[in-house]
C-alpha cells in the first residue's frame, strides 16, 4: 500500500536505503529466460502460418546489437529479427521498449477485459513509467487510458502526488484493490496471445457451381414450354428465364403472323 503524505505519514524511505539511481523493478527476473512479446507480424509478406503475430509471447535466445534471436512460445520456431519488433516483459506487466501506440494495440487485442493493464518504461524520461489501462464502456468502444508514473529523487513512485509507493509492485497492488483516481481498478495484466488462429484472411471453401447440361446452340424450342420438373430434379431453365424467353419469342413472331 502506498503512503498518504497528506495525512502526515512518511512518504519516503531514509536516505541510506534509497537514492536517485534506485531501480524499483528489475527487467530480468530470471537469468536463464527472458520473456518478450512480438510487436507486429514478422517477417512481413510471409505466409500467415510462418509469421509472428502481434502479442505473441517469445523467449529471447540471444541479443546481438539491433538483431535478436527469439523463439515463439506458440509455434516453437526461431526468428532472427530486428529488436524494434520485440518488447521485453517482466512480471507479466512491465514492458521495456514499448511505445504508447503499441501498448494500445496490445491491450485492445481479444482476450483483454476491462481493467487489463501494463506498465511501460518511458522512452523519453529516464527512470519514469506509464500505466496503460483498458477501460470498458457498455455504450461505446473500449478505450485505453494512460497515466504517467513519476519518480521522486528518493526513488519512490507516484501517479498522484498525495500517494507514493516504494516500488511498482506496491503501486500495482494498491490500484488493483481500488481505482483511487484512475479510470478503474487494475484487473489483470495484458494477455499474451498464446491461443487462436494466426493472422491472415481466412480462405472460404470454394463454391461448387454445377455445370448445366443445356446446349444453347441445339436448344429445342419445345424445352421452353415444358412444365417445371418434379421436386429434386435439375431444371434446364429457371421459371423466370423460361417466361422471359417465351415473351421475347412471342413478340418477335407476332409481326410475322400478322403479315
UniProtKB/Swiss-Prot annotation:
CDD domains named among the record's database cross-references: SH2_SLAP
Region (Disordered): 1-30
Post-translational modification: Phosphorylated by CSF1R.
Lipid moiety-binding residues (N-myristoyl glycine): 2
Region (SLA C-terminal) residue spans: 190-259
Tissues and organs where the protein is expressed, per its UniProt entry: Mainly expressed in immune system. Highly expressed in spleen and thymus and expressed at intermediate levels in lung. Not expressed in liver, heart and brain. Isoform 1 is predominant in lung and spleen, while isoform 2 is predominant in thymus.
Residue stretches making up the SH3 domain: 31-91
Record keywords, A-Z: Adaptive immunity, Cell membrane, Cytoplasm, Cytoplasmic vesicle, Endosome, Immunity, Lipoprotein, Membrane, Myristate, Phosphoprotein, SH2 domain, SH3 domain
PANTHER family on file: PROTEIN ENHANCER OF SEVENLESS 2B
Name of the molecule in the record: Src-like-adapter 2
